[in-house]
Regions:
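Catalytic-loop of the protein kinase fold
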Residues: 159, 163-181
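Single conserved hydrophobic/aromatic residue that forms the stacking wall/gate
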Residues: 415-424
Length: 424
């Protein structure tokens, strides 16, 4: 039995945990509290005064501003695994983080399943690529297209709140979000590394595949070089767009068939995601189109954009994907904000309709504005009536202007219920 350790946090409260490492990250060792309501993560190496000051700001100043004691502040606690206390032990600094909600751990998996096991964290990576989700994730853990829309909505909403506080995550990726496609929930983790602009620079440049092209293009420059691009809110916006695209379509928007350097894989990756980054579904430049004949069976059909193009996500998301991966890929100032993604995802949720094929994995799809919509995932044509409400506003008496907002109404619609998909 491991020994119990009792410490006094910097805020004067008592922290108790067992002296046994339960998990290890890139820079921290994790211990479980005695009552298993929180974990204590200690930095493996002593941190400098600047890092201590940054963590103190995150734990105290920014936490108190976001997670206020009223209903609004409490609402946000489900969106972040935010550090709540700071402790010192054996010369090392540690942070106290609430234990992840049980919905972010796999449950209900058949013991004979050879890959994922019950109790494992639902790391976002499992649900990001066709190969992983098709080969390793059991059908009863995949969720539906609608629940994945809800999941992306939660991520966008969390990032909107973070950016509104003037903070940037700096390493937003599928590795730093926990997701639950079954309930449509998500939680941002690793919040101790947040960037406080103009005060605390980023610790890392990000995760490969999610690093903004302008950051990757100058990664070789020293930190004090004025030409070096560092993670900030605009680079978070790139990572958010990539994350939403991968969760909904199970492929990476920049992973096409073009090889930029045949001799050096690292240089090829740096060009693919950096200076030469090109959207695989670019409407006019076909240089980086996916070569379907080179895809593994486990990558299909999602890996082939000709089978499931990004337009199946509906008009609102299509417009933002264009801005993120065409207009804003190398022009950060025009990238969609987290608030814009949130709004587009809410509108898209209001435009979905149920698939009439009981065997369809997706179960839902976005109305395609035709009289005979067909599920893009299984091909089932919809039969029956399709009531669509178009919203207008009246700037003056007798004049009506479209709000660019439509609502699909069907017999199982829950529009009369206060849903968590609506902006708070």
């Amino acid at each position: 039995m491991a020994n119990k350790v009792t410490l006094t946090a910097t805020d004067g409260s008592t922290v108790e945990f067992y002296d046994e490492i339960k998990a290890q990250g890139g820079v921290k060792d994790v211990y479980f509290s005695v009552d298993k309501t929180y974990v204590v993560a200690f930095y493996r190496k002593a941190i400098n005064a600047n890092d201590k000051a940054r963590i103190n700001d995150i734990v105290n100043i920014h936490r108190n501003r976001i997670f206020t004691s009223d209903a609004v502040g409490q609402y946000w606690t489900a969106f972040f695994a935010w550090p709540t206390k700071i402790v010192e032990w054996k010369g090392l600094t540690g942070i106290v983080i609430p234990f992840y909600d049980k919905k972010f751990f796999f449950d209900g998996i058949d013991p004979s399943w050879p890959f994922i096991k019950n109790g494992q964290e639902k790391n976002g990576k499992w649900f990001s690529s066709a190969k992983l989700i098709n080969k390793f994730v059991p059908v009863n853990q995949k969720g539906t297209f609608l629940s994945r829309l809800h999941m992306c909505l939660k991520i966008a909403r969390a990032m909107r709140r973070l950016h509104a506080a003037g903070l940037a995550h700096s390493d937003l990726s599928y590795n730093n979000v926990l997701v639950d496609p079954l309930s449509g929930n998500a939680c941002i983790i690793d919040c101790d590394g947040l960037v406080v602009p103009h005060k605390f620079p980023p610790e890392v440049v990000g995760t490969p595949g999610f690093i903004a092209p302008e950051v990757l293009a100058t990664k070789a420059l020293k930190v004090d070089n004025p030409k070096k691009n560092l993670p900030q809110i605009s680079t978070d916006r790139h990572a958010l767009a990539v994350l939403i695209y991968t969760f909904l379509l199970n492929r990476h928007p920049l992973d096409g068939g073009k090889v930029w350097d045949i001799d050096d894989p690292q240089k090829d990756d740096d060009m693919r995601y950096g200076s030469k980054a090109l959207f695989i579904e670019h409407p006019t430049d076909k240089t980086n189109r996916v070569k379907a004949d080179q895809l593994a069976k486990s990558q299909l059909p999602q890996g082939d954009p000709t089978k499931q193009p990004y337009t199946i996500c509906g008009p609102y998301l299509k417009k933002l994907f264009d801005r993120a991966f065409i207009d804003g890929l190398h022009n950060p100032s025009v990238r969609p904000s987290a608030a814009e993604w949130e709004e587009a995802l809410v509108k898209t949720c209001d435009l979905v309709q149920p698939c009439q094929n009981s065997g369809c994995e997706a179960q839902w799809y976005v109305f395609d504005n035709t009289t005979k919509p067909r599920c893009p995932f299984c091909g089932k044509e919809y039969t029956g009536q399709l009531p669509i409400l178009n919203f207008y506003y009246a700037p003056s008496h007798g004049k009506f202007i479209s709000e660019n907002y439509r609502l699909m109404v069907y017999d199982l619609s829950l529009i009369h219920i206060s849903e968590p998909t609506r902006p708070y």
